[in-house]
Amino acid sequence: MLSMLESILLSVATSEAMLGILGNIFIVLVNCTNWVRNKKLSKINFILTGLAISRVFTIWIITLDAYTKVFFLTTLMPSNLHECISYIWVIINHLSVWFATSLSIFYFLKIANFSHYIFLWLKRRADKVFVFLIGYLIITWLASFPLAVTVIKNIKVHHNNTSWLIQLEKRELLINYVFANMGPISLFMVAVFTCFLLTISLWRHRRRMQSTGSKFRDLNTEVHVKAMKVLISFIILFILYFMGVLIETLCLFLTENILLFIFGFTLSSTYPCCHSFILILTSRELKQASMRALQRLKCCET
């Protein structure tokens, strides 16, 4: 039986998850509708659609995983179910981070303004960069999945073992956990680096505008700022997400601490929910579609 605080926290996390699913499904529906209407899908809309679909699956997986562990943790949890959920999460989580990183690289190549020949070469060959990212995704998948299998199997064994043995193996298991997530972590670091370069580009652009004596905020600055909001929010929310997943993993060693586990679930649910609404608010197309949807809902109520 859950305590009052645990029930409230679980309700908050579940509400976050449901809102995240609705927000991501909305992005998919808008982009797919435009795809059917225009008979083509732009690169940015493809990335946003793929990101939204992967996040819907991510939310379902972490929610299912949380509920099975909360209500089966003190009894007999089906180990095969836990193992299956963990494998699916490894694949979908990797794919979700890849789409988010691809989005950051797309913004960087489209918006940033550098005269360096490497940047100009990449800007002219954006399609090849995208193909390279697909190759990198496959390579990191192949490299990290065997380690993920080891971690999942070790957790399954240690969860059924004695407490002193768990304490003895904990450091090794956490090291393996970090290495198993090196693929998503490396992709995240690429997103951080592109955000840093985009910040430099914005700073240079503002200096250039000040040197020319312009006091008006131009379109290029607004585009830079919108992209920065998306990337910085992604970085902050993904750190919270990773912390939440790490807390949930650590709670496998602290089976009596349900509250801490639910807190980790709440943190991990924040990223796929909040960032999706930030994407909607910063995209003119998605924002207009959301305003039209809200107006229709108001008309239906009246």
Swiss-Prot record:
Pfam families: TAS2R
Cystine pairs: none
UniProt xrefs under InterPro entries: GPCR_Rhodpsn_7TM, TAS2R
Cytoplasmic side: 29-43, 109-128, 204-233, 279-302
Entry keyword set: G-protein coupled receptor, Glycoprotein, Membrane, Receptor, Sensory transduction, Taste, Transducer, Transmembrane, Transmembrane helix
GO cellular component: membrane
Subcellular location: Membrane
Top-level taxon of the source organism: Eukaryota
Extracellular-facing ranges: 1-7, 65-87, 150-182, 255-257
Transmembrane regions listed in the UniProt entry: 8-28, 44-64, 88-108, 129-149, 183-203, 234-254, 258-278
Residues that carry a glycan: 160-161
Membrane topology according to the record: Multi-pass membrane protein
Molecular-function annotations in GO: bitter taste receptor activity; G protein-coupled receptor activity
Chief place where the protein resides: membrane
Function: Putative taste receptor which may play a role in the perception of bitterness.
Note, other: Several bitter taste receptors are expressed in a single taste receptor cell.
Recorded family membership: Belongs to the G-protein coupled receptor T2R family.
Protein name (Swiss-Prot/TrEMBL): Taste receptor type 2 member 104
Organism encoding this protein: Rattus norvegicus
